[in-house]
Design a protein with these regions (language model features):
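Catalytic domains of cell-wall/extracellular-matrix polysaccharide-remodeling enzymes
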Residues: 2-140
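Structured C-terminal subdomain patch of bacterial secreted/periplasmic proteins
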Residues: 137-151
Length: 151
């Protein structure tokens, strides 16, 4: 489980102090609901530089394949646009705000399995290569190492 920011706000418009307070708020809520905290975040709007500058302390999991499902695209359009993008170690961005996303995720997972891919959690993806997620570091994908933007 990862955070997606306490308010889903644009980190460029939130004070550094408020950004640094987010992990405690998020983890307090997560612990009360599921019993565990998180170590990482997927920053809304992809604006991770503000989070790094504020030294919030999370590892930031971004994406290497964007489905643009939030635009309300059909499953067939999303699949036709994303099929040619996939490589080992990719992280796929999808949202739960559109009705078509669950079906698209199912169709995509089935297609990926047919192509020989194995779907992994973020922890599994990085652990397979022995990568330890570092605080205030951004990760986009992982295959035989890792692509990052450091502190």
């Amino acid at each position: 489980v990862a955070s997606h920011n306490w308010t889903h706000g644009d980190a460029r418009k939130i004070s550094a102090a408020a950004l640094r307070a987010m992990p405690e708020k998020v983890n307090k809520a997560l612990i009360s609901i599921i019993g565990i905290p998180t170590r990482y975040d997927r920053v809304p709007y992809g604006v991770y530089p503000a989070m790094i500058k504020a030294k919030v302390g999370w590892s930031y999991i971004q994406w290497s394949v964007d489905t643009y499902d939030w635009r309300g695209r059909s499953t067939s359009l999303i699949m036709s646009k994303t099929k040619k993008q996939f490589t080992d170690g990719d992280i796929v961005l999808m949202h739960d705000i559109k009705d078509n996303t669950p079906n698209t995720a199912k169709v995509m997972a089935e297609w990926l399995y047919e192509q020989g891919y194995i779907l992994l959690t973020v922890d599994e993806l990085f652990a397979k290569d022995g990568v330890t997620l570092e605080p205030d570091t951004v990760y986009f994908r992982c295959d035989d190492g890792v692509t990052t933007i450091k502190k």
